[in-house]
UniProtKB/Swiss-Prot annotation:
Cofactor annotation remark: Binds 1 [2Fe-2S] cluster per subunit.
Protein name per Swiss-Prot or TrEMBL: NADH-quinone oxidoreductase subunit G 2
Organism listed in the record: Rhizobium meliloti (strain 1021)
PANTHER family the record matches: NADH-QUINONE OXIDOREDUCTASE SUBUNIT G, RESPIRATORY NITRATE REDUCTASE
Domain 4Fe-4S Mo/W bis-MGD-type positions: 217-273
GO annotation (BP), single: ATP synthesis coupled electron transport
Length: 853
């Protein structure tokens, strides 16, 4: 620690701290323009100049490292004159259009001029004008170059934090201007972080343009509803209508940054596809009715359907309190453990739960990725969890964390990684087994004898040996290791085997003293919370097995009802039960299995065979189109609760308006259903349910609603001993020359909910098919061609996107476009999906030739 004195106030700071950071700790304000906390100091704006005793010239506080015994003054006549002169120079060419500028009322230049600027400008010359009109750089970002003060925040944010490198400067001197490539941002991430950090109105949000002033907005701090990173954001609404999103440096895992979905994708709540009133099926047609009529219909149709003849499926996008109450409703009112929270895959709980219990880290992401090594397994973190990617890039570049990649899809983070090991989709388990075997082989001592027998005979795929050697040597050298695992691993029919190999690697790292931490990279906002709340067929809240007598008794006493003893059916088994005519009632909340579960034909047949299909949602989904009863539920921002993100951080989800139309909150609808069965469901409010959760779920003990604050609160877990031992290695996957189709989220969408966003659709409305340049050339295809993808079960058409970094033999189709009906190509229990591709025009010509013959 060193001692510094600033404006006659002394304090001790860590060596390496800047004068600006020391002043902030004392509450002394030093004005800045170019400085931003997530970026290295630039010291170009000269607003933060201070006097340092013993130095002749003023020094920039943002870039000057404090020294022991240093004496600093921040508010002398010379400093005041210098600041005033700097502001006068900025105003010399700054347009006087504050009344029409969107930044009016929250402009840093306005604030600085009022606090430190001259009362009158010395300059009388005509102002420099680049363009007479604003330039629309992209569908969501618009620019007024005349207002730019050349702080370079936007350029550096785009390059150093986001990694897109879409903005840059052209010309020099007075003619310097910020712009995109060829005056456009068409190829950038459209995240809007440049807009967020712009201190003036140079970069603006086009969807928000001219809509409101900051003082007109009612602002609500809440959580992003898209991926599992759990970014904190502030929604601005006027008279209940969504206007914009901004974020705050001080709070949340994201520290002010957001991705395109979080900043521009929340307008989905204003979609025209909202369900306005309850509907029941009459004469084969869904007919709008009142809640009373819907209740009468349900009372007649529900009958005595319960137990194994009842099932429930709910979305992991909903709050913890809704998820908790749903599984409680299913178990105590409908008397069934047939509950699940995924409509895309069935998780092998018998291996997943022990891994989570033994290795999952509920620590801040910044702490977890600050370890010596971070191994990212599966998926594409750039597109699935963009803000997590920002944090990982920062860790690699500024904190010297060693990144390692093991996945099928390329990622922008590959450029910052020490080793990139390409895995075959569905073959991640084989790659993990190869890592374990290689790590055991280079370890001299300290390992049990049985490890060598259970990990021998596994080798990496052809061409991967160099990458494997680099990855293993980095793991061996590292003092501590974090594993970030994509949910892609759960899509494969080999998910169980893959998780076994993940367990092997975690065990081995623990034996080697690497202090392994595990976190999943969930692509749904509350998937972690859904697991914690027990929305799974074989566990109760807290991931406690149904078969555990003591745990079951504790919940039965609290709920005042008996819980079925046998584990229930997962989504796959429930659909099979429906198809066979054994499902009396299937209750689907916020989920759409008809569009998301593999084999659309099977799912449609199964849902149609259910005796009673109840769909509760904010939007009219494909599954709702088959329902017997449709109940309009509150959408995002219309009910309160909590989300638990990938870190295990529980955060408050706050509503900013009442449910639209005739919709009701999900909790109110659960109470409505329970009342029809004459089995009241208590408690019924978010806060009281939260209190019950904190009493019954060990990881949530000690949390309070009031204590969540702006940063949320971390759940806790004491790692349980691993008792499963080491699993046998996997055999090598079969090699095939057939193109293999994989799926996942694209950067601009998340699931299907984001398709209701007009803004996101303006950025990425058209579906696409992505493949390597090598494969495209082999098929005589070019970027932008309309192509046909055909499997044994179906086909689809979309534009081709050629990616030179994409692996040979793979085809990627995003899961986010409902019109594609991607699941109609897939077979249950098969992933990846073998396909063939051809150009649509060639296919049409071929068909015409066949007709002529």
């Amino acid at each position: 620690m060193i001692k510094v004195t600033i404006d006659e106030q002394s304090l001790e700071v860590e060596a390496g701290s800047t004068v600006l950071a020391a002043a902030e700790r004392l509450g002394i304000e030093i004005p800045t323009f170019c400085y931003w906390k997530r970026l290295p100091p630039l010291a170009s704006c000269r607003m933060c100049l201070v006097e340092i005793e013993g130095l002749r010239r003023l020094q920039p506080a943002c870039a000057t490292v404090a020294a022991d015994g240093m004496v600093v003054r921040t508010n002398t006549p010379l400093i005041e004159e210098t600041r005033s002169s700097m502001l006068d120079m900025l105003l010399a060419n700054h347009p006087l259009d504050c009344p029409i500028c969107d930044k009016g009322g929250e402009c840093e230049l306005q604030d600085m001029v009022m606090a430190y600027g001259p009362g009158e400008s010395r300059f009388r010359d005509p102002k420099r004008v680049f363009h007479s009109k604003d330039i629309r750089l992209s569908p969501v970002i618009i620019m007024n170059v005349n207002r730019c003060i050349q702080c370079q925040r936007c350029v550096r944010m785009c390059e150093e934090v986001v990694g897109a490198v879409a903005l840059g400067t052209v010309e020099k001197g007075m003619d310097t201007a910020v712009t995109g490539f060829e005056g456009s941002l068409a190829s950038c991430d459209q995240c809007g972080n440049c807009v967020e950090v712009c201190p003036v109105g140079a970069l603006m949000s086009f969807p928000y343009r001219y809509k409101a002033r900051p003082w007109d907005l009612a602002e609500t701090d809440t959580i992003c509803p898209h991926c599992g990173t759990g970014c904190q954001l502030t929604v601005g609404a006027r008279k209940g209508e969504f206007m914009r999103v901004r974020s705050d440096w001080e709070h949340g895992v994201n520290r002010e940054t957001l991705c395109v979905r979080g900043r521009f994708g929340l307008d989905f709540i204003e979609s025209r596809d909202r369900i306005k009133r309850p509907m029941i099926r009459r004469d084969g047609t869904l007919t709008p009715v009142s809640w009373e009529e819907a209740g009468d219909f349900l009372r007649q149709r529900l009958g005595v359907a319960e137990g194994k003849a009842a099932g429930g499926l709910i979305s992991p996008r909903l709050p913890n309190e809704v998820l908790y109450q749903f599984q409680k409703l299913m178990r105590t009112v409908l008397r069934t453990n047939n509950v699940d929270c995924s409509s895309r895959w069935s998780a092998p709980l018998d291996i997943l739960v022990p891994i989570v219990a033994s290795f999952y880290s509920r620590d801040p992401l910044e702490q977890v990725i600050g370890k010596d090594c971070v191994l990212i397994i599966g998926g594409n973190v750039t597109e699935e969890n963009p803000v997590t990617e920002y944090l990982l890039r920062d860790a690699a570049r500024r904190r010297h964390t060693r990144l390692l990649m093991l996945s099928a899809r390329p990622s922008r983070l590959d450029a910052d990684a020490r080793a990139v090991l390409r895995a075959h989709p569905g073959g991640e388990g084989q790659s993990l087994a190869a890592v374990v075997a290689a790590l055991v082989a280079v370890t001299d001592e300290g390992l049990p004898d049985d490890i060598f027998a259970k990990t021998s005979g596994t080798t990496a795929s052809s061409g991967a040996n160099d990458a494997l050697d680099r990855l293993v040597s980095t793991l061996k050298e590292g003092r501590s290791v974090t594993l970030l695992v994509s949910v892609d691993l759960l899509r494969s029919p080999l998910a169980r085997k893959t998780l076994e190999q993940l367990g092997n690697l975690l065990q081995l790292l623990r034996l080697l003293g690497k202090e392994p931490s595990l976190q999943f990279l969930f692509d749904r906002a509350n998937q972690m919370g859904a697991w914690d709340m027990g929305v799974l067929p074989g566990v109760l809240p807290g991931l406690s097995p149904i078969a555990d007598e003591a745990t079951r008794t504790r919940f039965e006493r609290s709920w005042g009802a008996e819980i079925p003893r046998e584990p229930g059916a997962d989504v796959d088994a429930m659909l099979e039960l429906c198809e066979k005519g054994g499902m009396g009632v299937l209750y689907v909340v916020g989920s759409d299995p008809l569009i998301s579960y593999p084999d659309r034909e099977f799912v449609e047949r199964a849902l149609g065979a259910a005796n009673l299909l109840i769909v509760q949602d904010a939007f009219l989904t494909d599954t709702a189109g088959l329902a017997d009863v449709v109940l309009p539920a509150a959408g995002y921002g219309e009910e309160s609760g909590t989300f638990t993100n990938n870190e295990g951080r529980t955060q408050a989800l706050r509503k900013f308006r009442e449910p639209a139309f005739d919709a009701r909150s999900n909790l109110a609808i659960f109470g409505f259903i329970a009342a029809l069965r004459e089995r009241p469901l208590q408690p019924s409010t978010e806060t009281v349910i939260f209190e019950e959760m904190t009493r019954l779920v060990p990881a949530y003990e000690g949390l309070t609603w009031e204590g969540l604050g702006a940063d949320g609160a971390f759940t806790t877990s004491a790692p349980k001993p691993w008792t499963s031992g080491f699993f046998a290695p996997l055999s090598a996957p079969a090699v095939t020359d057939v193109l293999q189709l994989i799926t996942g989220n694209c950067l601009f969408h998340n699931g299907y909910v984001s398709e209701h966003s007009e803004t996101l659709n303006s950025v990425a409305d058209d579906p696409f098919i992505e493949m390597s340049a090598q494969d495209a050339a082999g098929l005589s295809l070019s970027d932008g061609d309309q192509v046909l993808v055909r499997s044994a079960r179906g086909e689809l058409t979309a534009k081709l996107k050629v990616n030179r970094r994409f692996p040979h033999g793979l085809v990627f189709v995003p899961e986010n476009y409902r019109a594609l009906r991607l699941n109609s190509l897939m077979r249950r229990g098969e992933y990846p999906c073998p396909v063939e591709i051809r150009e649509c025009a060639k296919r049409a010509a071929s068909a015409l030739d066949e007709e002529r013959v």
